[in-house]
A protein has these predicted regions:
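Extended, low-polarity transmembrane helix blocks
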Residues: 1-33, 74-134
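Solvent-exposed, flexible loop/coil residues
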Residues: 40, 55, 59, 127, ...
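Core segments of alpha-helical transmembrane spans in multipass integral membrane proteins
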Residues: 30, 51-71, 85
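Alpha-helix C-capping/helix-to-loop hinge sites
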Residues: 49, 68, 91-95
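Solvent-exposed, well-ordered loop and adjacent helix/strand elements within mature globular domains
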Residues: 26-55
Length: 134
């Protein structure tokens, strides 16, 4: 299985993909760390959501794990899907629970979709390998 999915593309595209992954990973790591550290804004936000502070911790772990996956060769596609799914639920939460703008979550979700697209060969190789094992 190949750990670099865009090796057949140009160097600028590969570099751009890594830069994008780094930026998105940094954003999610910072957000997850703020949740885990109990930043006042995050505590208040999760009180408004109404599921309790345990959900803040779970969300923080999800974001940190996703951020780490975005910079781990071979797991980038997983991180993109993981965090893209997280942003889908964040959009729903912003619209239906918090009644606030979902735009930041939409943008982050689209950036994760772009990362998955750029790493689609890696994802396909993983699927092929998995189906051969099964």
């Amino acid at each position: 299985m190949s750990v670099t999915s865009i090796t057949s593309t140009s160097a600028p595209r590969r570099i751009g993909a890594w830069v994008l992954q780094g930026i998105v990973a940094t954003a999610f790591f910072a957000a997850g760390a703020a949740k885990l550290a109990g930043a006042a804004y995050m505590v208040q936000l999760f009180e408004q959501i109404g599921l309790g502070q345990w959900f803040r911790y779970v969300t923080g772990v999800i974001e940190v794990v996703g951020a780490l996956a975005l910079i781990a060769p071979g797991l980038v596609w997983f991180g993109g899907l993981w965090l893209g799914g997280t942003m889908f639920f964040a959009v729903l939460t912003h619209v239906f629970v918090l009644h606030t703008s979902p735009v930041p979550a939409i943008v982050l979700g689209l950036l994760n979709a772009l990362i998955v697209y750029l790493r689609r060969d890696e994802l396909a190789a993983t699927i092929r390998t998995t189906t051969k094992i099964l």
